[in-house]
Amino acid sequence: MASQGTKRSYEQMETGGERQNATEIRASVGRMVGGIGRFYIQMCTEIKLSDYEGRLIQNSITIERMVLSAFEERRNKYLEEHPSAGKDPKKTGGPIYRRRDGKWVRELILYDKEEIRRIWRQANNGEDATAGLTHLMIWHSNLNDATYQRTRALVRTGMDPRMCSLMQGSTLPRRSGAAGAAIKGVGTMVMELIRMIKRGINDRNFWRGENGRRTRTAYERMCNILKGKFQTAAQRAMMDQVRESRNPGNAEIEDLIFLARSALILRGSVAHKSCLPACVYGLAVASGYDFEREGYSLVGIDPFRLLQNSQVFSLIRPNENPAHKSQLVWMACHSAAFEDLRVSSFIRGTRLVPRGQLSTRGVQIASNENMEAMDSNTLELRSRYWAIRTRSGGNTNQQRASAGQISVQPTFSVQRNLPFERATIMAAFTGNNEGRTSDMRTEIIRMMESARPEDVSFQGRGVFELSDEKATNPIVPSFDMSNEGSYFFGDNAEEYDN
């Protein structure tokens, strides 16, 4: 990539920093997660949570959601201008679970947003620490990616539900900045653009006037983000066409869907970061660990290390399998929802099962669920090896893949063949090949057809022992390629509902 020199690393995006060297990046990322940890400890004190209750992932999620809601300016403003019955725009809260007489009970708490903002700033040296907020958003997004399927959303925008491997970050709020944009999959960006174009088709004033100019800027910015994810000239050239269109309409939607499909073989670069629940950072800070001094990275050994010695609990519903709940959270912690299960299993050291076979629902408990029979268990979040997270899609080649998911988006930089089912994917490319983008389409299809199965991605990259923090001895695993590797295969998971 010619533009590599102008790119900021994702730690820089994450911490909003300008160009920094590796040590400065490690320090500023450390400062960010340390701030999250300090905030969490303070909140546990405010809410009077016991040590055990503070390690409950459901409590962590409630506290994270409270601070995100406290800083959601546009929604806060909207709530103040459009008061709705029974909703205090100045307050935020959620369910907190406490242990009483050997049982778990749910208690709804309510706090002033102002108070939450004060505690957050105090934990972050008086700053707004937007990077920390984005970090929490990405953790929630990774958890959603591992938990829910987006079939409905894909179908609504005219995309194929089997393209789910392109949907990383599809539930991230718009305000998640550069760090958020970096982790969004190609399908997510395409979906956002299609929604925008559809509004323009239905609403004549969408692109007009003062607001329309702002809309247009946003549209072009999103096109550029998506263009930057593609690794071939033809895909990028097509994105230029989409961006420069005078009046975006159905032709652009067609082009975008074509590009999304092409990304199943000619993969985009999508960043992956291990973002952990706030309680994990809280535990480390409470035990005296100084993140800023020690430095921290979201893409190296650090998150694996942290999970190796953190004990986090989760509420378990009566018929759920605690091991499966652990797998779900482990995948979320390492943003591995779209990774090949064989690679993840090797790193974790235990076999991961496809989502359709998981006996567990989401981590969060709905307000109408009965707490009587709820139990809690330790989440097993440790791993056997660690591996570097990738921001590239890997080079592209072919291998037998499943009916439920026809490609993967690699998370770990580990040598392997990347599976995709060529017949299924190529079948989608018959038909419409005229119009302005025909030569680019032809070129893209040619590249896809010539993608070779024997090509190995991430050549020579391997996993590392947890004692090998400098990544000196890569272990290149060999995978049983006859096996099924996709997580969303034969799926029956719940849909994501806002």
UniProtKB/Swiss-Prot annotation:
Does this UniProt record's set of keywords contain Translocase? no
GO terms for biological process?
symbiont entry into host cell; viral penetration into host nucleus
Among InterPro entries, the record links this protein to:
Flu_NP (IPR002141)
> Which is one GO molecular function term here?
RNA binding
Domain of life here? Viruses
Q: How is it modified after translation?
A: Late in virus-infected cells, may be cleaved from a 56-kDa protein to a 53-kDa protein by a cellular caspase. This cleavage might be a marker for the onset of apoptosis in infected cells or have a specific function in virus host interaction.
Gene Ontology terms: cellular component: helical viral capsid; host cell; host cell nucleus; ribonucleoprotein complex; viral nucleocapsid
Q: Which residues cross the membrane?
A: none
Motif: Bipartite nuclear localization signal; annotated at 198-216
Record keywords, A-Z? Capsid protein, Helical capsid protein, Host nucleus, Host-virus interaction, Ribonucleoprotein, RNA-binding, Viral nucleoprotein, Viral penetration into host nucleus, Virion, Virus entry into host cell
Outline the segment boundaries, as ranges, of region: Disordered: 1-21
State the compartments where it is located: Virion; Host nucleus
- Give coiled-coil spans as residue ranges: none
Question: Record's Pfam families?
Answer: Flu_NP
Q: How does it assemble?
A: Homomultimerizes to form the nucleocapsid. May bind host exportin-1/XPO1. Binds to viral genomic RNA. Protein-RNA contacts are mediated by a combination of electrostatic interactions between positively charged residues and the phosphate backbone and planar interactions between aromatic side chains and bases.
Described by its record, this protein's role is as follows: Encapsidates the negative strand viral RNA, protecting it from nucleases. The encapsidated genomic RNA is termed the ribonucleoprotein (RNP) and serves as template for transcription and replication. The RNP needs to be localized in the host nucleus to start an infectious cycle, but is too large to diffuse through the nuclear pore complex. NP comprises at least 2 nuclear localization signals that are responsible for the active RNP import into the nucleus through cellular importin alpha/beta pathway.
Q: Which HAMAP family match?
A: INFV_NCAP (MF_04070)
Q: What is this protein called?
A: Nucleoprotein
Q: What is the originating organism of this protein?
A: Influenza A virus (strain A/Budgerigar/Hokkaido/1/1977 H4N6)
The organism's taxonomy opens as: Viruses, Riboviria, Orthornavirae, Negarnaviricota, Polyploviricotina
